[in-house]
Amino acid sequence: MGRPPSNGGPAFRFILPEVTEMEAILLQHNTAMPGRHILEALADKFSESPERKGKVVVQFKQIWNWFQNRRYALRARGNKAPGKLNVSSMPRMDLPNQMRSVIQPLSVPKTTHMTGNLPGMTPAPSGSLVPGVMRSGSDNSYLEFEAKSARDGAWYDVQAFLAHRNLEIGDPEVQVRFAGFEVEEDEWINVKKHVRQRSLPCEASECVAVLAGDLVLCFQEGKDQALYFDAIVLDAQRRRHDVRGCRCRFLVRYSHDQSEEIVPLRKICRRPETDYRLQQLHNAVNDLANSNQHQIPALDAAAKTPLSLPGATVPIVAPESKDPSLSATPATLVQPSSNAATVPAGSA
């Protein structure tokens, strides 16, 4: 799989009372991101706790990252769309060869970036605030976006698009407000390079859609902060699932600092363009199940049908019927036909 991460120090961890309090706040907000003043108050409170005072200062971004990561996890559990596989039906991740061929990245669709107004979407009036969640006119579905911050190179959910501008040189830019941040954190972002459709948190059964060579959004935990960065999957170690869910491990290389780390599936968000793999795999599983159902009745019918050997010189007689000629005439040696089974000498 590769070497383990080495970032010079232990990763920051929240203690149990802090996690319990943040989970209660997230529940009160119906899994929505709390306001900045709430997160800053939590950071100050945790820093002044007896366990941390004078030792570790909890930063606002660490609080924000925890809420963001937990919201991703809850969204992955709650949004179970049709066509996704059930872990209980696939206890082992050793897929048959025909299924492996289905999910090979032969023709992966290109990453969906925002290029001005997306197809099927109506441009907003000038000066109005455009939400970061938009409805696509093609299939009446919602599109959510994420943007890459120039301050730290990490990706954040877009709460709203505030304005746009066309530069004389270079690509157009859009001013975004990141989810959970206030106006002072607004940024002008390159539309073509750093705005795209939001990455998808992975359910336990979706590890089969994460393959070596994929671009993923990976949660990197450092000594002072934990952020979502682009990464390339270098290798995947498939393991048997259990009651805890997916136990597979993935070796990734982060694009911003070229560091490598072995991560579980819960830290990976896959790109939306990999949805076709899950759909193809789902279709393959259904086809296999249907073929097995057709084979079982055929086997039952074959067991009830009298056996007839083509070219056989001796007819097969039912046990209950008796032919007087068989007992009256001496047995004659019958040469087996070309289709009859032969018994090797010495096997009796």
UniProtKB/Swiss-Prot annotation:
| Cellular compartments annotated | Nucleus
SMART domains the record matches: HOX (SM00389)
Q: Where is this region: SAWADEE domain?
A: 154-260
Family annotation (InterPro entries): HD, Homeodomain-like_sf, SAWADEE_dom, SHH1/2
Q: Which UniProt keywords apply?
A: Nucleus
Q: Where is the composition biased (Polar residues)?
A: 324-341
Q: Which domain of life is it from?
A: Eukaryota
Task: Please tell me one Gene Ontology term that the record gives under cellular component.
Answer: nucleus
Q: Enumerate the residue ranges of region (Disordered).
A: 318-348
Q: Which GO terms describe its molecular function?
A: chromatin binding; DNA binding
Question: What's the entry's take on its domains?
Answer: The SAWADEE domain (154-257) binds to mono-, di-, or trimethylated H3K9 histone peptides, but this interaction is blocked if H3K4 methylation is present.
Function according to Swiss-Prot or TrEMBL:
May play a role in the recruitment of Pol IV to genomic regions associated with K9 methylated histone H3 that are targets for RdDM.
The protein depicted here goes by the name: Protein SAWADEE HOMEODOMAIN HOMOLOG 2
Which organism is the protein's source? Answer: Arabidopsis thaliana
Q: List the lineage, top down.
A: Eukaryota, Viridiplantae, Streptophyta, Embryophyta, Tracheophyta
